[in-house]
Amino acid sequence: MTGPASDAALAPVRRPRADTARTADLTSWDAPGWAGLRVVVTGLGVTGFSVADTLAELGAAVVVVDGDDGPENRARAETLRIVGVREVLLDRAATQALPEVDGAAADLVVTSPGWRPDQPLLMAAHAAGLPIWSDVELAWRLRERAGRKTADWVCLTGTNGKTTTVTMVEAILRADGRRAVACGNVGTPVLDAIRDPQGFDVLALELSSFQLHWTHGLAPASSAVLNLAEDHVDWHGSMDEYAAAKGKVYANTRVACV
C-alpha cells in the first residue's frame, strides 16, 4: 500500500482530477496506451466488475479493491482472475489505502459510484495526483472503436423519475427503428453496452450524481436534468455540490433540454 498520510491530513475529493500525461491520450478503444496502464478499480459490484473486465480486455494491469468478501464477490473475483486481473483485494483494510499495481504506483483509479469522496483510498489517490474516473468516463473514452458504430449518447439525470424517463426514451427510439438501450445507472452497464458486438445507434443513459461527480469529458448528443431536490447531501457534502454534480451533464452537451 502507498500513501503514508493519515486520514486527518486528507480531504474529501470535491474536484477530482481528470487526466495526467499518462491518461490524456486515452480517447478511444484503439489508443495504444491502455496496454500496461496500472489501474485500481474500487468496488466489485455490477459496475466494478464491468470496469475491471473491460480494462483487462484492453491489456491494462488491474487491481480491484472491495471491503466485502461475501460469496458473490468471491465468485466475481475468481472470474476476474481468469480473464487476467492482477489482484482482487476483498478486505475492508484494503479500502483504507491506495494499493500498488505490479509493484509500482497506480496511474489511474476508476471508482464505483457508491464510493464517497471522503473514502480513504480515494482521498489518497487524489492527494497523490491521480485521475479518478467513473465507469461513465471510461466508457466515454472507449466509445470510438475501429470497425464498430459509434452511438449517440442521450443522458438523463435528476432527483426523481430518471429510470421511468430513460426507459421511455429507449422505447421511443426502438419504435422509431433505432437500435437503442437503456444503460448507466439502470439496466445494462454502460461498458457492456459499448462492447456489444452489434453496437447501438443510441445509448439512453440514466446518470446518478455519484457517477457525474467522477465524470469529466462527457459530451453527449443531448442531456436533461429532470428535476432537482435536496438529496444525497451526506455524500456530496452540501446541496450546492449535489447540484453542481447534476449540472455536469450539461457541460459539453450538443443539445440541452432545460
Label each PLM-derived region with a short phrase.
Residues 1-134, 138:
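N-terminal leader/targeting and accessory segments in enzymes
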Residues 97-104, 113-257:
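Phosphate-binding loop of NTP-binding sites
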